[in-house]
Amino acid sequence: MISPSTKLYGLIGYPLGHSISFYIHNAAFRALSIDALYINIPIEPESFSKAILGIKYLPIYGLNVTIPHKERIIDFLDEISVISKLIGAVNTVYLEENKWKGENTDFGGFLETLKELKLDKDLPCLILGAGGAARAVVYAVIEYGFKEIYLTNRTYGRAERIAEEVKKNKNIEIKIIPWQERHKVDEKLILINTTSIGLDGKSTPWNGNFKSIAFVYDIIYNPKETPLLSLAKENNVPFKNGLDMLIYQACLSWNKWFGFIGPFEIMKREAEKLL
């Protein structure tokens, strides 16, 4: 129930039609009797600067940030966390001591799922993509303890930049594979898709051999089963979509907004109704 003292939280990005954040956060607010409302705030890229300056003066207590604004938001914040600096992206904004601060909970959300899956750290992982999500995933797999990491992207230079930054920040070598040669890796590995290929429910970033794949992780959560995951299923390869990562990053946002981690099971139940 909205009241005169209801606190506003929201999601900024463009477009926002695919997002279920509105539903999961509001379901959790209702379940825990928190007097708050989570709203979608679609901001077109060309209007971003003016819009974000306006938002900073409105009674909004916290934000999630999605594509294409995760990198641009940094310039408008007073402080960002160490991991946000490393990744170069922020997906959670919170107000503390009258300062707007930024955190990256995509990193923590993905890391939580890796811990649950207990994937073999001795297997190499091949990460598809080199956008903001890929950066969070790269640092999460390093934190988890994978010994060998391959990275491939349609734009070779973007993958190269991530590898250079990781070498500088963590002194860890990431091997870059040209996109057109990604299927040539023939050792047993874990495949992680961070690209948007599959969002349309028709395309897949991997048409190669599944015999060398030990596990497939697609961070897309809608559709629930992307063509990549359907292929994994057909080839009897265990797989996971991005829903738990989404829920965990949402729960970790609450830690910055309210001082406690959000209710995972409540949010997940709501998400599963929608997908």
UniProtKB/Swiss-Prot annotation:
NADP(+) binds at residues 129-133, 153-158, 219, 242. SUPFAM superfamilies: Aminoacid dehydrogenase-like, N-terminal domain, NAD(P)-binding Rossmann-fold domains. It catalyses: shikimate + NADP(+) = 3-dehydroshikimate + NADPH + H(+). The active site is at 70 (proton acceptor). Transmembrane segments: none annotated. InterPro entries: Aminoacid_DH-like_N_sf, NAD(P)-bd_dom_sf, SDH_C, Shikimate_DH, Shikimate_DH-bd_N, Shikimate_DH_fam, Shikm_DH/Glu-tRNA_Rdtase. It is an enzyme of class 1 (oxidoreductase). Pathway: Metabolic intermediate biosynthesis; chorismate biosynthesis; chorismate from D-erythrose 4-phosphate and phosphoenolpyruvate: step 4/7. Involved in the biosynthesis of the chorismate, which leads to the biosynthesis of aromatic amino acids. Catalyzes the reversible NADPH linked reduction of 3-dehydroshikimate (DHSA) to yield shikimate (SA). This is Shikimate dehydrogenase (NADP(+)). It comes from Dictyoglomus thermophilum (strain ATCC 35947 / DSM 3960 / H-6-12).
